[in-house]
Amino acid sequence: MRGIFRFFWSNASGSKTHFHRKCPSRRNFLYSQFLFPDFMVKTMKEEKTLKRDGEVRKAWERAPIPLEFKVYLFNVTNPNEAAKGAKIHLQQVGPFVYDEWKAKANITDYPKEDAVTFHMLNTFVFNANKSGSLTGDELIYVPHVLIVGLASAISRMNPESIGYLDMAIPFLFGDPSTVFVPVTVRDLLFDGLPVNCNETHFAQAIFCNEFQKNPGFVRKDEQTFLFSIFGARNGTPDPIMFKVNRGLRNPHLVGEVMEYNRSKAQKVWSAAKCNEIRGTDSTILPSFVTKDGFDVFAADFCRVISSKFVRELDYKGIPAYEYTVDFGDPADSEKHCYCTTYETCLKKNTIDLTLCAGVPFVVSMPHFYLSDPEYVNAVGGLSPRKEEHEIVFVVEPMSGTPTMAKRRVQFNIILSRNSEITLLHDLNEKQVILPLFWVDEGVELGEKYLSQLRMLTGLPGMVNIGAIVIELIAGGLVIAAMYIKFGRARMGKQSPEGNNQ
């Protein structure tokens, strides 16, 4: 039974991700050969490491400025009709803007391995000015994530127990009339939705016994727990430990994941290739990145995500590379091992987290941008647009400094009719991948830092700029660490200065 609650709270192979250098463009060739002689190139590489007390290390450990973190939610505008089988219609609400402070906790160096271990730590502070008229008190209708998640998990793992959930729902969740429930944005994201554990029914007690063991649920009082998307981990270190290369011996390997959760391979997917752990932890890039792109180990997606070079460009007077990311097509032979079974594969540019996170969640780009039109048309109210919904980032290649980044990821839930659950009994017979919310995590360097980047002959200044913005790329494609594994065990809170609204 306990395994069901991975939903609430539930890398590092010997292979290395090298940043192979292709033939540089004429422009960058001139920069590297004339403005950066060999000894300066060597110095830059050596400075872009995670050595103790270095400027890069300090910024890597705790970002000096916050990311802008925007959340857009989807309001179900026809909840009663949808509960009876009608097509679901959505209205986007947002953005709700937060300052996201990124840091690392429980840091330990291992000099013999040239490695460092740590736990990710994120703190969110509501930015009322950037949110405009939105306050968090707005009322929206969403599918009750706990009901849908529990129904899916129990049906898959312990189907003979599904009747207990149906009996417990009225007591746990206030006897909702449909699976689409009214919530405030503030409660859904941070303050928490109530879970009643007065244990007046034996089925209710079964679930409450599990909830009380689970740090993903915040105890409000003796009879009530609270559950939210971000609340329990706001300002709290992630329990899963990373071990990454410090890059002192080989600067090309800085940030390369050596172990994740004390393991050098995963045990999630059906083939060794998909279980590989390789790439960076997303929080630092080496100097002299190339058009080959680079890999990121997206821990909460249980997979490696690869960037793709798009073009060279002049970014406000700085020679730069533009990269993008998509999630590929599970139908491709190399990615087929990411499917939940050989027969059940989602369509392109989606990630099924059922096996990874123990919950029927699907990751995509916002509004199913670059995904199959079937997903876009299954619900009303979606309008995918490249300029608003793609993942894109621009990097000054010599220093590995991101000058602009837009990381946009949508989280969806698989909503299916279930004849054993009263609230799911009358849903449309066709399964739907229903958008819940999407995030836009971004940064653009201000003129202060851009002007220093333009002074390419100023090596020390250039390296320090890289240090300042290293943490601004943190999170990258590992955004799901903030929303998906609600069920992973959490540690004691730190960074008490954080708040939600």
Write out the residue ranges for each language-model feature:
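Extracellular or lumenal secretory-pathway regions
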Residues: 2-319, 326-501
